[in-house]
């Protein structure tokens, strides 16, 4: 069953600065008559849910603490599991709410152990044809960590020319609960909640998911309210208990929101740079036409908490004959002078219809060596999950295809039900 969010739509509580207006797309309210899920809620959202069913406000702090533990430490799927919650309250909760997660439409496992989930969110009405928006998230296991790549939007507005997600139009922002629920789904699938596997004590030690990267579908800083609240839930030490130093938010360069991200989320920052000249970055990352490289790097220099211990990661996709020359490497080092940084070199991951090729391995190594010798860590990101289109730049949900088919059928006088009856998962 898909998750129905009780959280208010992103952007409802905190206005963006006038200089930067996010796209007018939000997570719409739950369908009438549908129970909302408590999974993914903030503490305040959970408090308001309890008040809404008649729990006295003086009791809410204790009740929120109890339920929070079952949601985010134990991973409860039924209210009956909540042994320290009174029978009457459990009955009330079951009457009004669920503990549903997003529906797992498909799970693919790569030869290298990477997992990709296609998740369907709760339906919100005509906006998504009563079916529910679809997004992807990816789990990447490593020797000393496990990284979950989460999405912040359904689709993307940025149309970066090398990115598969950029070929899918933006449908809407995800709510806080929909972002957090991606971590809940991953922990469910991996048996990563306390009590599900031996040695799980609620802390980071022994966890399979140790790191979160906002590098899935969408531009996180265009949905910053929801992202900040999601990070607060993920890093709450009485719940999901991730360290904020293990949460990284990647942006293509929404300059006016970068400082606020640092002040309110205190997360690690990654920049999708990919070029050292404005004319090339204008093509690769069209947002550069609004916020050129000089403005972006100035915002990076002023990022709250920036230090050698909290470096900014600059992502640089290696495109054959496009941005991979010795001159590009020298220019990159000059641009980043004075910024505590590391540079992630990303071998381009091909996807159907792309016009780019990955740089030769020898060229990538030469580029990396030049940057390293200039004093910057320059790891080459090992491509993971390429065989299931789960690697960097390859994510794309089925939503865009569904919307196109819906428009076509509606033009032919067919209802939305026909679209989904015809869709084979």
Swiss-Prot record:
Cellular component GO terms held in the UniProt record: cytoplasm
PROSITE patterns per record: RADICAL_SAM
Binding-site list for [4Fe-4S] cluster: 156, 160, 163
Top-level EC class as recorded in UniProt: transferase
Biological processes annotated in GO: rRNA base methylation; tRNA methylation
Subcellular localization: Cytoplasm
Active-site residues, record numbering mapped to chain: 136 (proton acceptor), 392 (s-methylcysteine intermediate)
UniProt keywords, alphabetically: 4Fe-4S, Cytoplasm, Disulfide bond, Iron, Iron-sulfur, Metal-binding, Methyltransferase, rRNA processing, S-adenosyl-L-methionine, Transferase, tRNA processing
HAMAP family registered for this protein in UniProt: RNA_methyltr_RlmN
Name of the protein in its database record: Dual-specificity RNA methyltransferase RlmN
Name of the gene this protein is made from: rlmN
